Amino acid sequence: MATTEKPVLSKYRDRMDKAVAALKEEFGSLRTGRASASLLDQIHVDAYGSSMPLTQVAAVSVPEPRMITVNVWDRGMVVSVEKAIRQSDLGLNPVVDGQTLRIPIPPLTEERRKDLAKIAGRYAEQQRVAVRNIRRDANEDLRKAQKDNVISQDEEKRMETEVQKMTDEAIKRIDEALKTKEQEIMQV
């Protein structure tokens, strides 16, 4: 019979923190009315015979609130970078200026804002589910440890309460991040 270790709650807290961080990263790729360098993080460019992230072939900066500039390091890659940005589903139209691409960020329509808010809500729900799954894993480990007499019943209940507190805290942070992102999206 395999021995059961005493469950360590910090590993579950770390996993929940990673779920919240992943949500914030996903939110970064959602287009709002303002320019953000992270908007282009998901774009891959066909470069040197393979698909590479845009950040590996160019420097992305935000000189103005509604403008992103992409400084391509290799002059021969400008066309590929422009093509990748145009083909992305972000609806952006870069303007080529030598080795620099200027990408004006058009204002969002009300309909598009609502769609983005729904997408943000979907991302948040995915992470809430992930946090709940982590809670389930933690509680299963606690039950197994109690069953194998590694921890007492009282300790199991105390730790389950702690796991629930961690879950509530993580979901609260997810909800706060969603609220902030929705406000950012709906801001005209």
Curated annotation (Swiss-Prot):
GO terms for biological process: cytoplasmic translational termination. The keyword Protein biosynthesis applies. It holds the Pfam family RRF. Signal peptide: none annotated. It comes from the Bacteria. Its main location: cytoplasm. InterPro entries: Ribosome_recyc_fac, Ribosome_recyc_fac_dom, RRF_sf. Keywords: Cytoplasm, Protein biosynthesis. It is found in: Cytoplasm. One of its GO terms (cellular component) is cytosol. The keyword DNA repair does not apply. GO terms for molecular function: ribosomal large subunit binding. Belongs to the RRF family. Responsible for the release of ribosomes from messenger RNA at the termination of protein biosynthesis. May increase the efficiency of translation by recycling ribosomes from one round of translation to another. This is Ribosome-recycling factor. The lineage of its organism: Bacteria, Pseudomonadati, Pseudomonadota, Alphaproteobacteria, Caulobacterales.
